[in-house]
């Protein structure tokens, strides 16, 4: 596997291999590989806590040395292009790039590079490692995906998580439904839109999405009322109590408590939000291993 850019580039076999390796790292069944003498640079052009820190911990556990990159102090501020920035890092011997960027499909500009790239999120396009860690979390709970009913609630149109998960979960055999305000519907994704209260007692997984304030613009924000959104699309205690006994609640985070989910439900028994974060570190180790080992996915 030369790069991890989009879930569309992964077969089901690739997905299972990556999550199984991550599960083996987590259980201790498989020894962590060490990449002593290898260098990685994390280029985050958008804010991040979980993804950035998770990659950093994963890299350190695998023996990688980080070449620090800060957008605010780099030559990007002087007008240097993304390609030239990445080509510079390749030229000085960096072995892996982890990139988050506000531009959809930014990686199309980097096709001439000879260095592995892990996409840590491109605009509202894709977020493959988030999708993979979500899949890992579901796999740990259910052992398979065939026939699972999954409800994804929220800002579908602007969510790279929704897009990545829809692509992968449908391919793996799950049934995916969306619930969203009309202005956040994404017609490019062929899934039914439902009212959350009509299906809340039937789903196996409720996947809540953060409201993407930074992508809405002035008009979108003017029309947003947190309380109204919570009442119509959020996971309230009443809705939580209607979930099936073995249903789980997921959220890619950061969580807007009291908007997407009642604050007291973030760590409720059915919630797997912090487990997702733990799994993310192991999953990203699996991805790094695949990219640096040169094995075919």
Swiss-Prot record:
Example of a GO biological process term: 'de novo' UMP biosynthetic process
Sites where the protein binds carbamoyl phosphate: 50-51, 100, 127, 130, 253-254
A molecular-function term among this protein's GO annotations: aspartate carbamoyltransferase activity
Reaction(s) catalysed (UniProt annotation): carbamoyl phosphate + L-aspartate = N-carbamoyl-L-aspartate + phosphate + H(+)
Binding positions for L-aspartate per the UniProt entry: 78, 160, 210
Transmembrane helix listed as a keyword: no
Keyword set, alphabetical order: Pyrimidine biosynthesis, Transferase
InterPro entries given in the database record: Asp/Orn_carbamoyltranf_P-bd, Asp/Orn_carbamoylTrfase, Asp/Orn_carbamoylTrfase_sf, Asp_carbamoyltransf, Asp_carbamoyltransf_Asp/Orn-bd
One of the record's GO cellular component terms: cytosol
One Pfam entry name: OTCace
EC number: 2.1.3.2
Pathway(s): Pyrimidine metabolism; UMP biosynthesis via de novo pathway; (S)-dihydroorotate from bicarbonate: step 2/3
Family statement: Belongs to the aspartate/ornithine carbamoyltransferase superfamily. ATCase family.
Subunit composition and interactions: Heterododecamer (2C3:3R2) of six catalytic PyrB chains organized as two trimers (C3), and six regulatory PyrI chains organized as three dimers (R2).
Described purpose of this protein according to its UniProt entry: Catalyzes the condensation of carbamoyl phosphate and aspartate to form carbamoyl aspartate and inorganic phosphate, the committed step in the de novo pyrimidine nucleotide biosynthesis pathway.
Protein name according to UniProt: Aspartate carbamoyltransferase catalytic subunit
UniProt source species: Staphylococcus haemolyticus (strain JCSC1435)
